[in-house]
């Protein structure tokens, strides 16, 4: 079975269907790009895959042992996110929160993995800085590191280069 299977999905928001009859499969190792106009349901599909909202009709099934907790997510950035008053290392570590359960602290292994992800995205030198003081490109790298910490087996990116200059966008895709 495919890792992710969408069956006859109808998706919408504000009580209005924006996407109907959607069927798809995603296998391990696949890259899937969802392209469409503003308001066409791209983010709604992401939220439905993550279980943040139900489909209006149809079903999403996970196979091969994949669960929603195995999926990392880089959402569209909002003004609230841009002005978030936390250290970069805290934001990146928060990618592990879905695994913590009732445990109130991150393990040494999780802290080390967060540092590795910061290095991977070229942002290790930002770990002790306040997130809201960073440029848009730096913030996107930090959020990508956070999503990578959460992603055990799958990664969803929702408009990851919006607002970035061409060089920063190319660097983001290069990761």
Where do the language-model regions lie?
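Helix-to-loop junction immediately C-terminal to a conserved catalytic motif
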Residues: 50
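Conserved ABC ATPase signature
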Residues: 130-134, 138
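Conserved ABC ATPase "signature" region
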Residues: 108-126
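Conserved ABC transporter NBD signature motif
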Residues: 55-71
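The feature captures the beta-strand-to-loop junction immediately N-terminal to the Walker
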Residues: 35-37
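Hydrophobic anchor residue at the start of the ABC signature
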Residues: 144-145
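Catalytic Walker B motif of ABC-type/P-loop ATPase nucleotide-binding domains
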Residues: 155-159, 164
């Amino acid at each position: 079975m495919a890792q992710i299977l969408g069956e006859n999905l109808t998706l919408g928001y504000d009580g209005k269907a924006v996407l109907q009859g959607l069927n798809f499969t995603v296998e391990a190792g696949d890259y899937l790009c969802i392209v469409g106009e503003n308001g066409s349901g791209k983010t709604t599909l992401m939220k439905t895959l993550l279980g943040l909202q139900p489909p209006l009709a149809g079903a999403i099934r996970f196979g091969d042992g994949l669960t929603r907790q195995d999926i990392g997510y880089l959402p569209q950035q909002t003004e609230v996110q841009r002005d978030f008053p936390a250290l970069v290392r805290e934001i990146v570590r928060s990618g592990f929160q879905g695994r913590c359960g009732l445990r109130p602290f991150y393990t040494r292994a999780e802290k080390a993995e967060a540092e590795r992800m910061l290095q991977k995205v070229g942002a290790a030198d930002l770990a002790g800085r306040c997130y809201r003081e960073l440029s848009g490109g730096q913030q996107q790298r930090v959020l990508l590191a956070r999503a990578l910490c959460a992603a055990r087996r799958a990664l969803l990116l929702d408009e990851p280069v919006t607002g970035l200059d061409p060089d920063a966008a190319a660097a983001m895709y290069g990761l």
